[in-house]
Amino acid sequence: MNKRKAVISLAGYEDIFEDSMENGEREEVVRLPISQFHMFRNHPFRVVDDEKMEETVKSVKQYGILIPGIVRPLNTGGYEVIAGHRRWRACELAGLKEMPVLVRNMTDEEATVIMVDTNIQREDILPSEKAKAYKMKYEAMKHQGSKGEKFTAVGEAAGESGRTVQRYIRLTELIAELLDAVDHKVISMKVGEKLSYLSVEEQGWVWDCVKTSSVQIQDRQAECLKAQSKQGLLYPAMVQDILMKKTRSRGQVTIPEKRIADYFPATYNKQQIEEVIYLLLEQWKKRQEGV
């Protein structure tokens, strides 16, 4: 294989690839045929031929690739792209045959962490992409034996908390239709997280209801579905009943004193009676929601 090597010096290069310095020497950039590139296994991020890609292609035609990608050699031949999938696609569309890259030997876990961290801060990432990426990085860090709070460590590159990372990873438990609904904002992320605790079959019932009735699932409804599922009480008719409930306009409700007087000691004043009523209503509400 013929490789044309060229050392490229870029301003701020060390800031972009902090670990590209080995033994005090700059890592060498090589130009490789893009025909030898392979997509990262289970790559979670889209590479779309959209308006932004058109802008990237124009830049590549005018200036070339200013920031090298990162690849690793494969035992089967060729190179797996770790960072630079969009640049690779832009090269294809621009008619370029080669692309500047850093070639590194690294483990699957190391490659996964770099792949996620170099993509996670993009502005146009879908919830499903971030969910899959965070899960991949979390699993990689577990295999590496990383110490400390892993969820927090996973979110560091994107400036997100460990709790937020957990919520995203939960979304990977959704069936494809519901995950797509989260991406398209038909279902909120908060609702999607709660629905992720339902079984695949139960999620199918939910999707059928959303698809046929165009219902907007509220957080309280999702919480109720989750609670019923946990107790093994959820079935198709109940899903429909929970999701199809509509808020009714209520007028003022007045209960005559004579109707409730016999239920309270004669010594109870109005405030004490109201407190008991509110407590009982709250307990009733929780039973209705299956909490």
Where are each of the predicted segments found?
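Amphipathic, charge-rich alpha-helical segments that serve as recognition/docking helices
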Residues: 45, 89-174, 197
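Short, charged/polar connector segments at secondary-structure boundaries
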Residues: 1-104, 115-121
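Short polybasic/polar patches that bind polyanions
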Residues: 61, 92, 156, 182-183
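Short linear clamp-binding motif
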Residues: 1-22, 260-264, 268-285
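Residue-level marker for well-ordered alpha-helical positions
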Residues: 54, 85, 149, 175-176
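Charged, low-complexity intrinsically disordered regulatory/assembly segments
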Residues: 286-291
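Amphipathic alpha-helical extensions and coiled-coil-like segments
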Residues: 33, 132-139, 162-279
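Glutamine-centric residue-chemistry signal
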Residues: 43, 65-67, 121, 144, ...
